[in-house]
Amino acid sequence: SIPRVTVDQAKFGEEISLNEVQIGDWVFFATGQVGLISHVGLIIKEKPDIVFIHASTKNGVREDRLSQKYYKDRLVKFIRPFKN
């Protein structure tokens, strides 16, 4: 089953590169302490820009782009949780 905690979710599945990202992959961010995974999103669009959905504490569930400075600066890694 899928782990409940974000840091454990980051160990679930296979780590992939930016060039391999597909719809359904997970993207992880360090939104607090540098390098410490604390937030996850689900990729919903891969081209021309990566778009992901996630739950924001202040704004609820929302869509954002990986190209936004806030997320680009906090990107840690991508995971493919399930094999295609």
Task: Label the model's feature ranges.
Residues 1-23:
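Catalytic cysteine-centered active-site loop
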Residues 16, 33, 38-84:
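Aromatic- and glycine-rich peptidoglycan recognition patches
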